[in-house]
């Protein structure tokens, strides 16, 4: 089955075109050009701001000229991740997709439905001449996944609409009306390398095949974090013997739970069998701990070539730090109606070793900004106690619920009419661009919804095909009835 045979055909045709365009975060130039050409080809007012956001304005259809101007918004970039054995250049190559039952998947890579499917819905509406709607502004932001660059750089007045539908949510049947704020904390350990003591034996330990996932939406699913697992083992062995660390590399993205990692270390030759036994026991325990969430994890331990190691004093501080830093959910929402929702969390996202530095990135999220500040300071303090140089991003704000939202009421009533059931109206423990929009456009009425996606930011990302039709029908009905 090809994408063009999927329903609604016009949406999947647009998605197929989008997936021909390389669009990693911070490298959206070709996508920006495509959107500009699309708008101009259709004769619509098309504008690009200095950040690279694109807006295409479509006039109202007959009889809807007096409706409020509705903004449809999605982000044009995608997270690029792949299986270890997949050969792809995300800056040049297309995403290859296939249908598996009711799911659309990619061949060993992220699918790019986050948020390519939102872009495809917007383009399909722009391309149509048979859909009723008021004045429309279709907005495509850049670099949402790494830095929210587009939303952060957008100036007040670029969007002129009264209401906004963000098409970057991942559970059909759920209408999101608030989101978490977030910050990123980075730490750097600087060191000199030295030769390992004579007679030391080098080992390489690895882990792969973890489930991973989105560091906001999936943080409460108790999935394994490759960095924390490898850190546990290093701390355990360092406590028993003179271990010398040479390399620690795991994770790529601040908003993804790390799925694999490799460490290289040296131990006295007479301890190498102890390490092997400990590793076997340790990995068996980890497999038991995560036997529900991470069923495909694989471990490796092998001898490797000698290399210069990190200075002992720095290595010790780093390993202790990585054992001490917490990961996962810190607090659930206190409101009884939202007790199921994560309030505050931290994701230890990446550790990268270079010749004379170890760089660590951790991302904090909270729906309560004071708790976000406290959590960020807690992570910062752990790094500082370990002697690391610490930097914190400016972060992005939470999007607060608007109890008087007209758009929410219209969206809920439309859903009930179309599908005969109540949608779930909720907040999300992830950053949405709506939080930044709410700062620059304080009177903007917003909701967020989208088709069902699973395992975004991983090569297991998949799109539930039937829900695309449901979201399409829902959005068109909202536009007709505003």
Which residues does each predicted region cover?
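Acidic/His- and Gly-rich active-site-bordering loop/insert found
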Residues: 2-102
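Midchain, well-structured core segments that form catalytic/ion-binding scaffolds
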Residues: 102-105, 145-146, 152-365
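Substrate-recognition/cap regions that form aromatic- and gly/pro-loop-enriched pockets
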Residues: 341-426, 430
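Active-site-adjacent substrate-binding region
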Residues: 218, 225-228, 232-248, 401-444
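Zn-dependent metallopeptidase/amidohydrolase metal-coordination segment
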Residues: 7-11, 343-358, 363, 419-477
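His/Asp/Glu-rich mid-to-C-terminal helical/loop segments that flank catalytic regions of hydrolases
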Residues: 222-240, 269-272, 317-326, 332, ...
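Active-site metal-coordination/substrate-binding segment of hydrolases
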Residues: 64-146, 151-162, 202, 315-318, ...
């Amino acid at each position: 089955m090809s994408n063009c045979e999927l329903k609604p055909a016009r949406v999947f045709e647009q998605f197929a075109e989008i997936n021909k365009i390389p669009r990693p975060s911070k490298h959206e130039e070709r996508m920006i050009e495509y959107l500009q050409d699309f708008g101009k080809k259709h004769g619509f007012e098309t504008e690009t701001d200095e950040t690279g956001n694109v807006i295409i304005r479509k006039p109202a259809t007959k009889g809807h000229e007096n409706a409020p101007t509705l903004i449809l918004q999605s982000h044009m970039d995608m997270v690029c991740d792949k299986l270890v054995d997949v050969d792809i250049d995300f800056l040049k190559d297309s995403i290859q997709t296939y249908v598996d039952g009711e799911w659309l998947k990619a061949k060993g890579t992220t699918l790019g439905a986050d948020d390519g499917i939102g872009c495809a819905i917007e383009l399909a509406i722009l391309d149509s001449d048979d859909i009723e709607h008021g004045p429309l502004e279709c907005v495509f932001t850049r670099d949402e996944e790494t830095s929210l660059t587009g939303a952060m750089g957008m100036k007040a007045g670029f969007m002129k609409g009264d209401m906004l539908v963000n098409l970057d949510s991942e559970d059909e049947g759920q209408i999101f009306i608030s989101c978490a704020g977030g910050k990123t904390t980075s730490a750097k350990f600087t060191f000199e390398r030295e030769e390992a003591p004579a007679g030391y034996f080098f080992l390489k330990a690895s882990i792969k095949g973890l489930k991973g996932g989105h560091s906001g939406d999936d943080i409460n699913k108790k999935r394994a974090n490759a960095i924390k697992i490898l850190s546990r083992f290093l701390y355990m062995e360092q406590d028993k013997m003179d271990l010398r660390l040479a390399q620690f590399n795991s994770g790529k993205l601040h908003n993804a739970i790390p799925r694999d990692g490799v460490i290289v270390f040296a131990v006295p030759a007479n301890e190498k069998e102890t390490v092997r036994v400990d590793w076997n026991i340790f990995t068996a325990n980890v497999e038991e701990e995560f036997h529900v969430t991470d069923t495909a994890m694989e471990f490796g331990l092998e001898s490797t070539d000698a290399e210069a190691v990190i200075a002992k004093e720095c290595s010790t501080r780093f390993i202790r730090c990585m054992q001490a830093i917490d990961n996962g959910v810190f607090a659930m929402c206190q409101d009884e109606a939202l007790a199921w929702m994560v309030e505050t969390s931290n994701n230890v996202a990446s550790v990268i070793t270079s010749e004379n530095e170890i760089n660590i990135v951790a991302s904090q999220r909270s729906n309560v900004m004071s708790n976000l500040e406290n959590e960020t300071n807690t992570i910062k303090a752990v790094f500082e106690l370990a002697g690391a140089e610490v930097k914190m991003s400016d972060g992005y704000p939470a999007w607060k619920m608007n109890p008087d939202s007209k758009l929410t009421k219209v969206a809920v009533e439309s859903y009930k009419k179309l599908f005969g059931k109540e949608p779930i109206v909720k907040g999300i423990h992830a950053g949405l661009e709506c939080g930044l929009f709410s700062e620059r456009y304080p009177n903007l009425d917003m909701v967020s919804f989208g088709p069902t996606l699973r395992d975004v930011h991983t090569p297991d990302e998949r799109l539930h095909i039937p829900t695309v039709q449901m979201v399409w029908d829902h959005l068109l009905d909202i536009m007709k009835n505003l």
